[in-house]
């Protein structure tokens, strides 16, 4: 099977609407991301419904806690059978290492474990507001390096950091990029954005795209256009 680069971010407060959308797209064309709102509303059974329909799921809950608690949450995600799960890199090396180690018994069936660096909505002024007098890119590099040293599979980062991180951390270190907007779509609340082709050319491995697909009149056609653009 082709390794789909597009991850569609589901953003619904109604489960029926979410599943109605999912039934309009092909599991071969993308993966799906389930975040905090949907998981809190609908729980693990919603993820199981997506699995029944043939989709791989990125469980985007950004765990951040003491090592014991965080690692057990990651193990619960593995038990659920998700393809990818993430933790906040700012939780530190011990937290990330514990989360990686708890997945070892799952072998090849384990989910990818990804670190979250700097949220794409954050600018330098936001970092300064929490006491970090550093440019977003510099902080991303610091946290991404810590993530790799902790043995994780990759990081979530903006496309602007992708090229630099690929060079710094190697081609095998996966880069998951939100803030992706196909040409002609609105910027929304993501501050650091790039088109799908630009992001892949910069080094991103997986592209998180939400409203430009979920709110499209023909989401399957939008997915096809994006995937076609990535093969040029």
Swiss-Prot record:
SMART domains: OMPdecase (SM00934). GO terms for biological process: 'de novo' pyrimidine nucleobase biosynthetic process; 'de novo' UMP biosynthetic process. Transmembrane segments: none annotated. It comes from the Bacteria. One of its GO terms (cellular component) is cytosol. Keywords: Decarboxylase, Lyase, Pyrimidine biosynthesis. Pathway: Pyrimidine metabolism; UMP biosynthesis via de novo pathway; UMP from orotate: step 2/2. One of its GO terms (molecular function) is orotidine-5'-phosphate decarboxylase activity. The active site is at 62 (proton donor). Its EC number is 4.1.1.23. Substrate binds at residues 11, 33, 60-69, 120, 181, 190, 210-211. The keyword Transit peptide does not apply. It catalyses: orotidine 5'-phosphate + H(+) = UMP + CO2. Pfam families: OMPdecase (PF00215). It is an enzyme of class 4 (lyase). Catalyzes the decarboxylation of orotidine 5'-monophosphate (OMP) to uridine 5'-monophosphate (UMP). Homodimer. Belongs to the OMP decarboxylase family. Type 1 subfamily. PANTHER family: OROTIDINE 5'-PHOSPHATE DECARBOXYLASE. This is Orotidine 5'-phosphate decarboxylase. It comes from Vibrio vulnificus (strain YJ016). The lineage of its organism: Bacteria, Pseudomonadati, Pseudomonadota, Gammaproteobacteria, Vibrionales. The gene is pyrF.
